[in-house]
Amino acid sequence: MSSSPAILPVTNQQAATQSQPPINSHAFRTFLSRLSSSLRESLSQRRPWLELVDRSSFARPDSLTDSFSRIRKNLAYFKVNYSAIVSLVLAFSLLSHPFSLLVLLSLLGSWMFLYLFRSSDQPLVLFGRSFSDRETLLGLVLTTIVVVFMTSVGSLLTSALTIGIAIVCLHGAFRVPDDLFLDEQEPANAGLLSFIGNSAATSAAASVVAGRV
C-alpha cells in the first residue's frame, strides 16, 4: 500500500502583499514627529512682534552698503519672524487660488504616498502594471516639472515668494539694528532654518529614498 505524497505548504503571495501597509508608517510617524518638534522649536525662538514693528527703530539707510548691513543683521535676529511672514504670504496666495492649492497638495500627496513613505517591498501597481522604484521616481519628477513650469502653480509660487522676500528686505533695510543684534551670538543652525537645511538628511524620508536608489 503506497503512502500518499507529502503536501508542501504554499504561501499565498497575494494575501501576504495585501496584508502589508501601503506606506511605511514608522517613517511617516518619524517625519511628522521631526516636523512638529522643529516647528515648536522655531516658534519658541521667534522675536516679539512688537519689537519687529517698533516705529522708533525705523530710519532711512544712509547708503546701499548700510542697507545690506542692516538686512544681514536683521535676518540673523528676526529669521523666524521673517520665515513666518514669507509663509503667510505664500499661504494667502495659495488660499486665494484654490485650484493651484489643490494641484500642489495632490502633487505633494503623490510624492509622499507613492514614493517617499511607500513600503519598499510594496510594488506600485497602476492600470494592471507594476512599476519599479526608478520608474516611479522618474514619473513623479516629470509630473513635478510639468506642474511647476507649465501651469499657473509655478508662477504663483514665484510671485508669492518674490513678494515675501521683498517685504523682508524692505523691513530689514529700514529697521535700525541696535546693540542687542551685535552682542547676541546664536547657533548657525537653529529652529525653522535648521529644519529646512538639515532635516532632509536626517529624517526617515531621506533614509527611505536612499534605500530605493
UniProtKB/Swiss-Prot annotation:
Family according to the record: Belongs to the PRA1 family.
Disulphide bond pairs: none
One GO process term, biological-process aspect: vesicle-mediated transport
PANTHER family the UniProt entry points to: PRENYLATED RAB ACCEPTOR 1-RELATED, PRENYLATED RAB ACCEPTOR PROTEIN 1
Listed InterPro entries: Prenylated_rab_accept_PRA1
Gene: PRA1B2
Stretches the record annotates as Disordered: 1-21
Topological category with respect to the lipid bilayer: Multi-pass membrane protein
TM stretches of this protein: 75-94, 98-117, 137-157, 161-181, 190-210
Location of this chain's protein in the cell: Endosome membrane
Function text: May be involved in both secretory and endocytic intracellular trafficking in the endosomal/prevacuolar compartments.
GO cellular component: endoplasmic reticulum; endosome; endosome membrane; Golgi apparatus; Golgi trans cisterna; trans-Golgi network
Superkingdom, taxonomy of origin: Eukaryota
Protein known as: PRA1 family protein B2
Keyword Secreted among record annotations: no
Keywords: Endosome, Membrane, Transmembrane, Transmembrane helix, Transport
Assembly, per entry: Interacts with PRA1B1, PRA1B3, PRA1B4, PRA1B5, PRA1B6 and PRA1E.
